[in-house]
Amino acid sequence: MRKLITLAMLALTSIAWGADTNEAPVGFGLWNSAHLKEVGDRLEKELGDKRIVYETLGTYKGHSVYLVLRGKTAPAEFHETESDLQIGVRGKATFVIGGELVNPQKLPRKQQQGSSIKGGAKFPVGPGDIIHVPVAVPHVLLIEPNKPYMYILVKLDEEPRNDPPK
């Protein structure tokens, strides 16, 4: 009898260990290509004559992930505490980094904007290109008229947002 109980317990333990444990841990995020295409197509419909539209893909402690579509060149920017990682998805643009902000203005969340950048290095960017923007370095994406540029943006050490999530 003792052998039977031991075997039964071993069998139940094996079944329990073999149970489906495919639950992702808290904080895990996966945005597959089909989802990114769906969101990207929707953003293209929303863009119209706007400068930028985006969708927040995930928000985590200290960083967030966005899918961004730029339709026009925005003001140059500078983040006092955040760094950015950008991965090109669709279209082409020119990325300018370094130099000095022209007419800088302080913004909330420890950021600054300027009308342009004086100096700076220019790089053509497109799908698959990865850009790392260090903390406290001016940068801007130059967008050609009627040629939007889409990219995944990971904001690292992001200052808390006060606006409602999209």
Regions found by a protein language model. Give the residues of each.
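A generic "binding-loop/recognition-motif" signal
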Residues: 71, 81, 137-138, 147
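A short beta-strand-loop-beta hairpin characteristic of the jelly-roll/cupin
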Residues: 92-127
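Bacterial N-terminal signal peptides
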Residues: 6-15
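Conserved short histidine dyad/triad with adjacent acidic residue
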Residues: 62-84, 89-92, 96-102
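Positively charged n-region of N-terminal signal peptides that target proteins for export
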Residues: 1-4
